[in-house]
Amino acid sequence: MSEETIRLGRERRYLVLLGIICLALIGGALYMQIVLGEAPCPLCILQRYALLLIALFAFIGAAMRTRRSITVFEVLVVICAIAGAGVAGHHVYTQFYPAVSCGIDVLQPIVDDLPLAKIFPLGFQVDGFCSTPYPPILGLSLAQWALVAFVLVVILVPLLTSRNRKALR
């Protein structure tokens, strides 16, 4: 096995782990929705879409064979994480300033018309308000945890990729 093959295998494992973590986060959100009765707002649903896209691109990237194709999907993962961080950041802002509505009247029909809301309404249909406070987990709200997760993806994916490929140059 060549050095490049070993390093690309490591990147593939990172991507598979990232995809599994994103699916676990969506599973946790569904658990909180179904079992704990915490209704998802439009911004929550958009964050779920971002996590799902990150997982999808991570799994596809892990299936790629060339460095260039893996890089393309790593870039897509980072773009989705940046979008997710933007949504989560706005959600955190909305929770700190409840007078600022997330626009449930505007966003709800748009989010509810997305394809997954029709296929899997339990997981991707809006049912709550963005300013509704839920009990924090380890001192942070769900929106804050989502922001942390997205920022970690934005930082760690390029960092791990560049460190992994540094010796190949």
Swiss-Prot record:
It is a multi-pass membrane protein. One of its GO terms (cellular component) is plasma membrane. The gene is dsbB1. It comes from Pseudomonas fluorescens (strain Pf0-1). The chain crosses the membrane at residues 15-31, 50-64, 72-89, 145-163. Disulfide bonds join C41-C44, C102-C130. Belongs to the DsbB family. Its main location: membrane. Residues 1-14, 65-71, 164-169 are cytoplasmic. This is Disulfide bond formation protein B 1. GO terms for biological process: protein folding.
